[in-house]
């Protein structure tokens, strides 16, 4: 996978003060990907060292009062060309910088105060549809023994649990909030495994319960809360869905957004709020753009076809009618299923980083679809899904 990274984050002395800002998590990522080092400020010909610069009223000013807007724009376009000419889809830039800041930058008073805004290079990259994050994202998404990656698996995908080198197993009946009387459906197992996959600390949940079985939204999302209690900051959902014809096709996909059509919400139940600071959760970028970009990069490297689209969560358990499929198509929905939606809401409320992979096992509303046929289709893509998950974990 190709990634553009701010040179200062890799230890190069290109900052205004002649120093660098090396970040170990970024350097660790750089060892696993094909890196293009960029620094729009030195690319423009600005010297090192130089006075600090900040944006103010749409211009870039040095602390000595010099207007260096044109220099920053020139350097940003040079860096942009280096990124686009190499077909790079991910850039890791220095936070708060007047050239590389993402969503916040210094306000131009040289007082350390931050305001909403983008660096000069960041603006150009975003206009090109490139995923741009700062070193803070990389640090936050770095798994450890204290912060393992959670994987919650759906129908026919529980085989991923077999990849784990186990350290401990947990019966779902011992998980707070999980219904003790629940029995796993075909293709599910109710025993979590803590361990590692290729050396990456993980907690794998190879089964779940659903609303249509009569369980509450809080019970349906209890595994997410348990993962959070175990220290998980990153969570990967993988489940079978139906592909809405015209918007998606069968096979593997990554979910970019969702519509909750279940008629309920875990944050509307007292039991679902026990670990949540506020029920008023921002659902913009609910599915981490960074993790989605990693998944697409891994898929490209491994020659795995990976589609993407919006997911609609329904109550179920019946499969969709033709009229429902037509409605979902008009809504811009690509995938439809009976899990994931509530779990994503809970994960976001707990400030977890979410990646949702889907196996579109059948065309939504197709004749002859059964639970067994979904399981059989899942087996067809099992190897590619395994390679994809292992590839993503390897980049975290």
PLM features per residue range, with description:
Residues 8-13, 60-68, 106, 201-215, ...:
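Short, basic, glycine/proline-bearing loop/turn elements
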Residues 58, 141-283:
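Metabolite-binding pocket within alpha/beta catalytic cores that recognizes anionic/polar moieties
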Residues 43, 52-78, 82, 113-141, ...:
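Divalent-metal-activated hydrolytic enzyme cores
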Residues 19-36, 118-122, 165-186:
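Short catalytic helix/loop segments, enriched in acidic residues and glycine
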Residues 364-396:
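His/Asp/Glu-rich mid-to-C-terminal helical/loop segments that flank catalytic regions of hydrolases
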Residues 21-62:
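Short, surface-exposed acidic-centric catalytic microdomains
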Residues 99-100, 107-124, 128, 190-200, ...:
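Mid-sequence, gly/pro-rich, charge-dense loop/helix-turn segments that line enzyme active sites
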Residues 338-374:
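Zn-dependent metallopeptidase/amidohydrolase metal-coordination segment
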């Amino acid at each position: 996978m190709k990634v553009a990274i701010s040179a200062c984050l890799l230890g190069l002395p290109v900052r205004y003060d002649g120093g660098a800002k090396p970040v170990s998590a970024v350097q660790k990522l750089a060892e696993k990907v094909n890196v293009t080092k960029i620094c729009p400020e030195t690319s423009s010909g600005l010297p090192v060292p130089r006075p600090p610069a900040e944006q103010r009223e749409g211009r870039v000013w040095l602390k000595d009062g010099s207007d260096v807007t044109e220099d920053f724009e020139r350097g940003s376009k040079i860096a942009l060309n280096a990124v686009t000419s190499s077909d790079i889809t991910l850039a890791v830039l220095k936070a708060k910088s007047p050239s590389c800041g993402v969503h916040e930058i210094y306000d131009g008073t040289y007082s350390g105060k931050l305001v909403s805004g983008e660096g000069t290079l960041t603006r150009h990259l975003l206009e090109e549809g490139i995923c741009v994050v700062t070193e803070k994202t990389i640090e936050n998404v770095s798994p450890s023994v204290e912060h393992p990656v959670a994987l919650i698996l759906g129908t026919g995908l529980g085989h991923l649990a077999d990849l784990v080198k186990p350290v401990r197993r947990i019966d779902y009946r011992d998980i707070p909030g999980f219904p003790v009387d629940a029995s796993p459906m075909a293709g599910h197992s109710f025993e979590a495994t803590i361990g590692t996959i290729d050396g990456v600390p993980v907690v794998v949940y190879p089964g779940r319960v659903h609303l249509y079985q009569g369980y509450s939204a809080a019970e349906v999302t209890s595994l997410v809360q348990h993962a959070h209690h175990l220290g998980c900051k990153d969570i990967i959902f993988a489940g079978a869905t139906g592909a809405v014809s015209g918007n998606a096709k069968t096979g593997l996909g990554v979910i970019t957004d969702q519509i909750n059509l279940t008629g309920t919400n875990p944050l509307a139940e007292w039991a679902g709020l026990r670990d949540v600071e506020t029920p008023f959760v921002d659902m913009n970028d609910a599915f981490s753009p960074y993790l989605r970009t990693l998944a697409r990069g891994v898929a490209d490297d491994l020659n795995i076809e990976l589609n993407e689209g919006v997911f609609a969560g329904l109550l179920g358990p019946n499969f969709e009618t033709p009229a429902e499929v037509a409605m979902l198509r008009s809504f811009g929905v690509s995938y439809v299923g009976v899990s994931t939606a509530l779990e994503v809401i809970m994960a976001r409320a707990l400030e977890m980083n979410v990646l949702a992979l889907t196996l579109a096992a059948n065309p939504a509303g197709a004749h002859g679809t059964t639970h067994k046929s979904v399981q059989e289709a899942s087996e067809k893509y099992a190897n590619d899904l395994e390679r994809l998950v292992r590839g993503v974990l390897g980049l975290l």
